[in-house]
Amino acid sequence: MNQKAIGRRQFSVGLGAAALGGFNLAQAQGEGRIVLGQSAPFTGPSAQLGIQFNLGAKLFFDRLNAQGGVGRRTVEIRTMDDGYEPDRCAENTRKLIADDVFALFGYIGTPTSLAALPIFTQAKVPFFGPFTGAEALRQPFNRLIFHVRASYYDETALIVRQLTNLGLKKIAVFYQNDAYGKAGLDGVTKALADLKLAPVATATVERNTTDVKAAVDKLVPAMPDAVVQISSYGASAAFVRAARKAGFGGTFYNVSFVGTQALADELGKDGAGVVVSQVVPSPYQPSRQITREFL
């Protein structure tokens, strides 16, 4: 096995992931560092998703590097801003691969990750830890993609089970009008169909906007018990406020991609009763070993 393959295997072990060493991938960096490429939103309405993910990753890698890195090589993240726009993400991906990053890491979102998919697949560059649960990145299987999150199908199935167990069976869906939102809608619809139910209403919002009036006008008259939101924090917060102002008295459930802290910050006191599902351990439960490491 060549040195490049050995390096990738050491890197993946350092992250606690499956080995990346078997691929003939982008050129490894010099002996002193491993450079990961991240395209994510660092500006615009979804900026906090990219900013917070990057800060968390840097916190881990700073600790890893202080302990000697991976095979005595430090790990660095090279970031590029895509504003949560697929075309910009695709261009960033081409540039990062041209710059010979070791792997792509921490991409934010479904439409952006799907834009990068054919590019990194053709280049045979690993795609590690995307912040998305889209089924389109899981089926068909792609040996270059390494997931660390549950799928949206799994997440929405548990949301629907929770709601119906509480007797809340009239469920509406507010979703982003792109691959992410449609993946979440499909998950909710499938979970309801398994119970011989269907959404009482659905409505959309465009990506990177907060124009929710049409969605409120469509969903509130359907009188749902709950609204499952498949959007980013800005649009979700706008919908919560507008729906309540229009007289909706039900509950709101969000998938984890919404950005829990960002949504809480956006809503402030209006966040009471808004639920966000989680697919990773809570950082606020010190009984867990991984949480103690984080703290």
Predicted regions and their residues:
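N-terminal secretory signal peptides and thylakoid transit peptides that target proteins
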Residues: N2-A19
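Immediate post-signal peptide segment of exported/extracytoplasmic ligand-binding proteins
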Residues: L25-Q38, G69-T74, T164-G167
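Short beta-strand segments enriched in small/hydrophobic residues
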Residues: R33-G50, Y107, I171-F174
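Beta-alpha junction/loop-to-helix N-cap segments that form part of ligand/metal-binding clefts
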Residues: Q48-L55, G68-A136, V205-V212, S232-A235
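Loop/turn elements at helix/coil->beta-strand transitions in domains of secreted/extracellular proteins
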Residues: R73-V75, D99-A103, A123-P126, F141-R143, ...
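Extracellular/periplasmic Venus flytrap/periplasmic-binding protein
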Residues: E91, E135-A136, R143-G247, S282-R292
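Periplasmic-binding protein-like
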Residues: L96, D100-I108, F128-P130, A172-Y175, ...
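Extracellular/periplasmic periplasmic-binding protein-like sensory domains
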Residues: V240-L295
